[in-house]
């Protein structure tokens, strides 16, 4: 019996690989809700965790201009997705997985090798 891929509510393709991670939104029991961000993986050193940096514009009322800001978010990296440093990924909000992890990687939009 082949393991089914769950519908997570986003219009993206599920990963081709299978995994047995219970914290995987595709093959496990993890539900996603809330915000969805796109960013670049800047670190993948902790096991099953990536640090994603996203850039956004913030309006400064005094100067009537926008400034570019960035934030770093820790996200769970399931084995079936396996994002690496330099990859452009899509992350979605979920329940707290640890003290600092509240997001999970749901897709790799562009691999680091393809971006060069």
Curated annotation (Swiss-Prot):
PROSITE patterns: RIBOSOMAL_S17
GO BP annotations, alphabetical order: translation
Superkingdom in the source lineage: Archaea
Alphabetically ordered keywords of this record: Ribonucleoprotein, Ribosomal protein, RNA-binding, rRNA-binding
GO cellular component: cytosolic small ribosomal subunit
GO molecular function: rRNA binding; structural constituent of ribosome
One Pfam entry name: Ribosomal_S17
NCBIfam families recorded: PRK08572.1, uS17_arch
PANTHER family: 40S RIBOSOMAL PROTEIN S11 FAMILY MEMBER, 40S RIBOSOMAL PROTEIN S11-RELATED
Protein's job: One of the primary rRNA binding proteins, it binds specifically to the 5'-end of 16S ribosomal RNA.
Subunit structure: Part of the 30S ribosomal subunit.
Family: Belongs to the universal ribosomal protein uS17 family.
The protein's name: Small ribosomal subunit protein uS17
Organism encoding this protein: Pyrococcus horikoshii (strain ATCC 700860 / DSM 12428 / JCM 9974 / NBRC 100139 / OT-3)
